[in-house]
Design a protein with these regions (language model features):
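Selective transmembrane alpha-helices of multi-pass membrane proteins
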Residues: 55-85, 139-149, 157-166
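Cytoplasmic-side transmembrane-helix entry/capping segments in multi-pass membrane proteins
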Residues: 33, 90-92
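Alpha-helical transmembrane segments and their lipid-water interface positions
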Residues: 11, 37-49, 70-73, 110, ...
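Selected transmembrane alpha-helices and immediately adjacent juxtamembrane segments
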Residues: 103-113
Length: 166
């Protein structure tokens, strides 16, 4: 859970870069949208996983696809040149709509939630109860992670802009 939530991905990078440019308070609306989208993606994937037979080839494909996606994403992120990660001062402010939309195009999230639901849904009781339990745990941890990344981005830029420290 911690690896999926605290490693860099679209949500974390958006939270840190947006707060670095616009300040930590600017992320409140964005984070609310991220949570709404995150919960929606969990409910969609949980409902699909609940309906798929665990012994099916499709279920195995989803499981392995999610794992391979994480590995590939990690390799790609580690190989990115640092120049590509520079902060552009012209970044527009984002709001809850962007936070929601990001969840539907965030491949890391879809893979992460798929793997979590496939591996743990039955252990959490299955059905809507299991889906809601997993959703509440991962959403809480994800929100805490986004808050941490938000304050990190804000503090980092404040330090770099300071005449004495930066």
């Amino acid at each position: 859970l911690a690896v999926g939530i605290f490693t860099p991905g679209p949500n974390n990078i958006t939270a840190i870069s947006h707060s670095a440019v616009h300040g930590a308070r600017s992320n409140i609306s964005l984070l609310i949208g991220m949570v709404i989208g995150f919960v929606t993606v969990h409910l969609i994937i949980g409902s699909v996983v609940e309906q798929i037979d665990e012994e099916s080839v499709f279920f195995s494909f989803l499981e392995w696809f999610g794992i391979l996606f994480f590995v590939a994403l990690g390799i790609i992120i580690l190989r990115l040149p640092i120049e590509r990660l520079s902060v552009d001062q012209d970044i527009k402010r984002l709001d809850f709509r962007h936070g929601i939309a990001l969840q539907f195009i965030n491949g890391k999230e879809w893979a992460f939630v798929s793997v979590i639901m496939i591996q743990f849904l039955d252990g959490f009781g299955g059905g809507i109860t299991g889906i809601l339990l997993i959703t509440s745990i991962t959403t809480t941890a994800g929100l805490l992670s986004m808050i941490l990344w938000t304050f990190t981005g804000h503090k980092l830029m404040a330090t770099l802009r300071d005449e004495r420290k930066g």
